[in-house]
Amino acid sequence: MSQTSTKVDMLNGPLFMKILIFALPLAASSLLQQLFNSVDVAVVGRFASSKALAAVGSNAPVISLLINLFVGISMGANVVLSNHLGQRDDEGVRRTVSTVSLVSVVSGVLLMLIGIGVSRPILELMDTPADVLDMAVLYLRLYFVGIPFFLIFNFGAAILRSVGDTRRPLYILVVAGVINTVLNLVLVICFGLGVEGVAIATAIANMFSAACIVVLLRREKGALQLQFNHMRIYGKELRRMLQIGVPAGLQGMVFSLSNVVVQSAINGYGSAAIAGSAAAVNFEYYCYYIIVACNGAAISFIGQNYGAGKYDRVRRIFRICMLMGLVGCFAANALFTWQNHFFLSFFTADPEVIRYGAIRMQGVLLFQFMACSYEISGSALRGMGESMSPTIMTVFGTCVLRMVWVFVVSPHYHGFAQLLQVYPLSWVLTGAMVLVAYHVRMKKLCAVRA
């Protein structure tokens, strides 16, 4: 397949099919990355023990907390590249590619060192039960050894997404997913390595993905080509990336921190609740990545059209992305919740673990489509270069509410199901605020143009 055939003209022509063609591979790519973690959870749950399942699953909020800042910066890179492309600024594209590439390497090494260093303290702070603590620490440290490669792939994929190429990163992840699955089974079943086996398998799969994305960028033509001999960090592009990416990343970090607080409360219900919640969360991630795909489409398409001054198309792009997110996410939410025992049985045969997992799916997963309201609205605002306002509203409406719920409300209503009610409540509150902010922004844009 030629490089041109993988790219999308975002500035001209009908939008619906272009957005769909862009979003489907992006959703599949995100789902495959989540599959790495799901395979880890399923293999240890089925072939090791429920405690090993709890050890791997309890790390998800910690991993999200530590990587979200850098994932946010990659989002900023996508916006900056999209704006330059919309303005037909090849030199700006070239400088941004160079900056993004170096930032991904530096960020990856920094995050690896931080992750390895804080693994035990942060898991102890979360009240991780003593019977799973050592396994959880081991998994987390080994996971972070591979994190530089994870970030190199994600920053590289952001470069390709800015021109509409979501298919080639998907092809890489398909192969990486097969590598991860095979290594998981070999290391856990044949060599009896348990949690360390699944962490090593994930790290090797991330190495493969990073190597492939670098090769693709080296083979690009024109301004998008990665040139090692001309690599440097350009201050203007870095500042713009950070202006957009850091608020988005901090939002993700605070968001994850609130989930760490909720996870700490879940830990108080014992290892069966931890394992059940860990299994159920996998399906939340699968559904969430439908929203992520629509977010990515909104950022790239709106970024280019905003850069080109095509505000009517910006409004249409937002509506299409919101519709796709709501319909797709709700359909997946309903399917997984309807057959919750069947899907949970992929991760464990323990009936008590399945019971807790089903409670989470019925109380949280079924209502997850509501998150589209603030996720896609926030992505639309970021595509227009406005990152701070959706961050502030999301931090307040989602993160602060969850912390207040755990520390103030939940102690008066003892129960696993009652604890989880905070998720749909926070989605409704945050969605209302960010939707209003988007419509205010569009009104101002149209007024200026008039």
What feature does the model see in each segment?
Residues 1-23, 81-146, 179, 190-246, ...:
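Short alpha-helical transmembrane segments in multi-pass integral membrane proteins
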Residues 74, 142-161, 169-180, 198-213, ...:
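Short runs within selected transmembrane alpha-helices of multi-pass transporters and secretion channels
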Residues 31, 35-54, 123-130, 186-193, ...:
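Helix-terminus/linker motif at the lipid-water interface of multi-pass membrane proteins
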Residues 53-113, 150-169, 263, 276-334, ...:
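Small-residue-rich hydrophobic transmembrane alpha-helices
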Residues 10-47, 61-76, 80, 105-112, ...:
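N-terminal transmembrane alpha-helices
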Residues 48-61, 140, 199, 271-286, ...:
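Small-residue hotspots at the loop-to-helix junctions and early N-terminal turns
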Residues 21-40, 142, 176, 205-209, ...:
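Transmembrane helical elements of multi-pass membrane transporters/channels
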Residues 20, 24, 36, 73, ...:
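Residue-level signal for transmembrane alpha-helical positions in Major Facilitator Superfamily
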